[in-house]
Structure formats: C-alpha cells, structure tokens
Regions:
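N-terminal metal-binding scaffold of metallo-dependent hydrolase/deaminase domains
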Residues: 1-37, 47-49
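C-terminal cap of metal-dependent C-N hydrolases
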Residues: 5-11, 332, 344-378
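Divalent metal-coordination and catalytic microenvironments
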Residues: 7, 22, 27, 46, ...
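His/Asp/Glu-enriched, well-ordered alpha-helical/loop segment
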Residues: 65-66, 70-75, 80, 212, ...
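Alpha-helical scaffold segments that flank or form the walls of functional sites
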Residues: 69-117, 127, 159-185, 189-191
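Active-site core of metal-dependent hydrolases
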Residues: 85, 180-277, 292, 332-334, ...
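Metal-coordinating catalytic core of metallo-dependent amide/deamination hydrolases
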Residues: 123-228, 232, 298
C-alpha cells in the first residue's frame, strides 16, 4: 500500500483543487482523504497532483524511423476495417518514454487517415514492453476518414472526390449490414451462414453499437457528412480533428457527440485546415460541446499534449475545461472513463505530480505513476 501525502489535488471532477492524501493499493485509487497512512509514503507537500493525462487520438507506436518503421497506413486498400492497431504498435518506440515523462499515461492509438476505413484504434497505457499487457480497451473505435487524405492517397486508383469517399463508406456499411442480417437469420445453421468475410466481420461491432466510427474530419462539410452517414446507419460516432468546429459550434452542440480537437501546434499544411485556430477548443466547450484536445502524434510529439491544452487556455479556454479536455473527456471519448481520466476511488492509480500548472512550460513533472507504480521521477 502506498500513500501520497499532502498534495494539492486536481481531480478533474471538482473545479477547485484541495489538499488531501491519496491511498493506493493493488494499482487502484483506494481512498482520497485526510490523515491517511500506509507502509510506503510519498511526500507531495507543495506539489500539484493531477490524473494521468489521456490522448483520445494518437498514432504513437505506429510511425517509426524511416519507411521500414512506418506502419500507420495501409497503402494498397482504401477499405480495410479488418486491420487492428494492436498488431502494429511498437511499445519500444521511444515516444512512449517521452509521453509518460510528460504525464501522458494513456493513449488511444491507431491507423492514419489514408483510407476511408482504416481499422480499429486501441486504448493503451504508455508503460510496458508487450502491447497485450498495456491494453485498456483492445478495440476502442473504427477509424474512418473524410476530406483530402483519402483523395490524395488514392486519387490515381479509386477515390478522387468527397462524393466517392462517402459512397465507399456507405457501400461498406450496407454490405456489412446485409452480412449481419444473413448471419442472424441463419442462427446456428452453419449451412445457411454467409461465406466468412473478415472485412464485414470487423464492421459488425460498429453496426451493433459496440464501438463508434472514429471520423477524421477537418472541414465543416466533412463533419456534417460524417454525422449524416452515422445517422443513416444508426451507428455511434466520434468526431476527430474538428478543425472548423468553431464555425459550426452551435450545430455541433445539438448533436451531443464527443469531439477531439487538434493537431494545432503545427503548420496548416492542407487547404482543409486553413481555418485552424487555438480558439476552437474553447469556443466548442463554451457552446456546450464535449471536447478533448489531441496531439495526433506524431504530427505533434506526444509529450506536448499539456502544452496544447495550455495554448487553448491562452486563446480563451477555461482552465478547468482544458484540464478535463486532457483527462476525463478523452477517457469518456474512448469509453474508458470507468478506469482513467479522474482521481476517484476505484479507478486506476494513474497520476501526475508536478511543481506547477501542466499548462506552463516552466513546470517540471516530478513523478508519474501508472497502475500505482512509478514510471518517471526526477
């Protein structure tokens, strides 16, 4: 049992921080209170304690050095929902070291946006040597993409317009729906079962509402296309990037969707991101949207997630909303808020101890715990 004493707690639940002790046992937060004791003690007097930071949209571990190490996109099939991030993530990627040293304890990582359907994202902790032991949620979402990326990557093959992108996604979902109907109608009769199709099997969890479509969409019209298609098929949806979200904030607030905003700490290298703004997270949050801030690592190095939140605060976002945008909101976004994202009894003991606000570049991360074990200390 471990007790962290006298730290100033920012639990991502209560707006105002408070001084308390944290009791940890078997990798879980056992209790938060005063006058707690354990065999092992960490003195956090004068320090700040936060939940481990969570990134809802990353590609960490899939984008290595040079072409031999790049596993982020399948370049020969525009529709490949059968791919799984867990089969490509390299836990030995040094980006994980940088991530946890900055307090990022959990990420949702997966395929890029070259394909209309790219495969499943996985939610993992940032410490470990074997991906199977790092998993929080094996299949967190099914990646789909709109806008420039599928067009650019497949322009000479099969996709040169936004209309084509939408049609390819619709066709895949229609085929998967028919496939599922045949499977359910056949029941246990193996002779009536449709021929096995790995791609269509991969889309069944989407149709059953077990995982959402994770829709890469920057431009406002692409965002609305993603919403339109999700509504047509009655499937769950999260919005990823949401670059022009500030232009349609009131409309997005009506949807109740989870939306991830970023990457913002980079050049506007594409036409569809020319309206990128640090004000976007704050505007969406103020409108009542459920907002997470993301790095899209390796577009932005994973360790700069708190800095991105700080830039959003500088542009007008409420600091408490910004904290929630890198803790409990991304945890809810990817469906793992029962385990991570806030400092509450029963959750994983993932926490960050700092000597100041994580939004300030002068702040030092003093200690990081994942599952109650120290993975970084200075």
């Amino acid at each position: 049992m471990l007790c962290i004493k006298n730290g100033r707690i920012h639990d991502a639940v209560h707006r105002e921080p408070y001084t308390a002790d944290i009791l940890i046992e078997n990798g879980k937060l056992l209790q938060i209170g005063t006058d707690l004791h354990a065999e092992q003690t960490i003195d956090a007097a004068g320090l700040e304690i936060y939940p481990g930071f969570v990134d809802a949209h990353s590609h960490i571990g899939l984008d290595g050095y040079g072409e031999p190490g790049v596993d982020i996109n399948e370049r020969n099939d525009i529709c490949c929902p059968q791919l799984r991030a867990i089969d490509g993530v390299n836990p030995m990627d040094e980006s994980f070291v940088y991530a946890r040293s900055a307090g990022i304890t959990c990420v949702c990582t997966g395929p890029g946006s070259a394909n209309v359907l790219g495969g499943t994202f996985t939610a993992i902790k940032t410490a470990g040597t074997r991906i199977d032991d790092m998993i929080v949620k094996k299949e967190a979402a099914m990646k789909c993409a709109f806008g420039e990326n599928p067009k650019r990557c497949y322009a000479s093959k099969c996709d040169s317009s936004r209309m084509t992108t939408a049609a390819i996604l619709r066709e895949a979902l229609m085929k998967a729906r028919l496939y599922l109907q045949k499977k359910e109608a056949a029941g246990d009769d193996v002779f009536r079962q449709p021929a096995f199709d790995m791609k269509l099997e991969a889309l069944i969890p989407v149709l059953r509402g077990q995982i959402p479509l994770k829709a890469h969409a920057h431009r406002a019209d692409d965002i609305f296309t993603a919403i339109r298609i999700a509504d047509e098929f009655g499937v769950r949806l999260t919005l990823e990037h949401t670059t022009e979200g500030h232009l349609i904030a009131d409309e997005l607030a009506k949807t109740g969707l989870c939306m991830a905003v970023g990457p913002s700490l980079n050049f506007a290298t594409k036409v569809e991101v020319r309206n990128k703004s640090w004000k976007t997270p704050g505007i969406l949050s103020h409108a009542g949207c459920h907002v997470s801030i993301i790095t899209d690592c390796t577009v932005i190095p994973q360790q700069y997630l708190p800095l991105c939140a700080g830039m959003a605060v500088k542009a007008g976002m409420d600091p408490f909303d910004a904290l929630r945008a890198i803790t409990i909101h991304p945890a809810e976004h990817i469906g793992i808020a029962d385990r991570v994202g806030s400092l509450e009894a029963g959750k994983d003991a993932d926490l960050v101890i700092t000597d100041g606000s994580p939004f300030e570049v002068s702040t030092t991360v003093r200690r990081v715990l994942i599952g109650g074990k120290t993975v970084h200390a200075v």
